[in-house]
Amino acid sequence: MKFELTTTDGDARRGQLTFSRGTVQTPAFMPVGTYGTVKGMLPRDIVDSGAEIILGNTFHLMLRPGTEVVKAHGDLHDFIQWQGPILTDSGGFQVFSLGDMRKISEEGVKFRSPIDGSEVFLDPEKAMQVQRDLGSDIVMIFDECTPYPATVHEARVSMELSLRWAKRSKDAHGDNPSALFGIVQGGMHESLRSESLKGLTEIGFDGYAIGGLSVGEPKEDMLRILNHLKTEMPADKPRYLMGVGKPEDLVEGVCRGIDMFDCVMPTRNARNGHLFTQAGVVKIRNAKHRHDTGPLDPTCDCYTCQNFSRAYLHHLDKCGEILGAQLNTIHNLRHYQTVMSELRAAIGKGELAQYVSHFYARQGKERPAIATQS
């Protein structure tokens, strides 16, 4: 992987990631394909959305179908018929979300499979091997996602364990030509975040992710941590904010130097009838859309908006039709890619501040005061 930074506007960055499988313009949003599928989307739909890279999940793919099935097809790209780059997360967050079903030790994590209840052990070495078998273009280290809330002591213990696992991940990654990203932890404590980042840069990685955010903390805390880290993150490496978020979170993240994002929100919300538009969120199952013959978003060029009315989408939602979830997802993912494209263009022109003002104004909102603090 090669990362080239082409333009900056304040703390915001525009660049390009180059892989053997293709190029990714940054800042970029990565649709989430947890089980090897972006829910409701054919591979060609993902391409049409403008996405250049997608995300898969090591934890879930390891449990089902298993790497042997994937390898029988070549690798994950061949299995799912997506020939662009793929980032796989290591499974640390999914293990964290198991709660009392898992037991963490220095060696790794022992847990019961949510599929059949069998005992499974996952450690940095296995996480690296699984991602190698999947053929990931970007591999994530195995870490512990610091719980929220966490005291300074609790966050420190978790962060230091993640650093030791980061070193083991790097050693196990070995001669794998794929990029390897470190993950900054430390909870909501700036000093621990700095310590985590320092430890990771001493080990040395191809990119650096910020983990442990979007785990239930107030927006103020997320922005505070991003403000703290934006001047400390290595300038020549890509920066990835994991699991974030709403369109406004992408905008605020980009303003703070983030290059990469992923989140299930556009796909999950689509299936629940919450659709993102230039004018704000549309709840398509609301009765007011029953007779609306207009498009969901007249400014959008997606297949859904170009061909179907709000009334039809409302009808599909009320009937529980699969096509409704599909058309909603096509739109939401295209909307996210449009926002990213607009951000890249604004950075390239040196007009990010104007774009941010316009982004909030077209939704009839004012930018939150906390977002303007640095």
Curated annotation (Swiss-Prot):
GO MF annotation terms: metal ion binding; tRNA-guanosine(34) queuine transglycosylase activity
InterPro entries the record matches: ArchSynthase1/Queuine_TRR, TGT, TGT-like_sf, tRNA_ribo_trans-like
Gene source species: Saccharophagus degradans (strain 2-40 / ATCC 43961 / DSM 17024)
Transmembrane found in the keyword field: no
Record keyword Membrane present: no
GO biological process: queuosine biosynthetic process; tRNA wobble guanine modification; tRNA-guanine transglycosylation
Family of the protein in this entry: Belongs to the queuine tRNA-ribosyltransferase family.
Region described as RNA binding: spans on this chain: 243-249, 267-271
Cofactor details (free text): Binds 1 zinc ion per subunit.
NCBIfam families reported in the protein's UniProt record: Q_tRNA_tgt (TIGR00430), tgt_general (TIGR00449)
Positions contributing to substrate binding: D89, S90, G91, G92, F93, D143, Q185, G212
Catalytic residues (positions): D89, D262
Keywords: Glycosyltransferase, Metal-binding, Queuosine biosynthesis, Transferase, tRNA processing, Zinc
EC number of this enzyme: 2.4.2.29
Function: Catalyzes the base-exchange of a guanine (G) residue with the queuine precursor 7-aminomethyl-7-deazaguanine (PreQ1) at position 34 (anticodon wobble position) in tRNAs with GU(N) anticodons (tRNA-Asp, -Asn, -His and -Tyr). Catalysis occurs through a double-displacement mechanism. The nucleophile active site attacks the C1' of nucleotide 34 to detach the guanine base from the RNA, forming a covalent enzyme-RNA intermediate. The proton acceptor active site deprotonates the incoming PreQ1, allowing a nucleophilic attack on the C1' of the ribose to form the product.
Quaternary assembly: Homodimer. Within each dimer, one monomer is responsible for RNA recognition and catalysis, while the other monomer binds to the replacement base PreQ1.
Any Pfam family hit: TGT
Cited HAMAP family: Q_tRNA_Tgt
First-level EC class: transferase
Protein name: Queuine tRNA-ribosyltransferase
Top-level taxon of the source organism: Bacteria
Cofactors: Zn(2+)
Pathway terms, separated by semicolons: tRNA modification; tRNA-queuosine biosynthesis
GO cellular component term of the entry, any: cytosol
Coiled coil (UniProt feature): none
Positions bound to Zn(2+): C300, C302, C305, H331
Catalytic activity: 7-aminomethyl-7-carbaguanine + guanosine(34) in tRNA = 7-aminomethyl-7-carbaguanosine(34) in tRNA + guanine
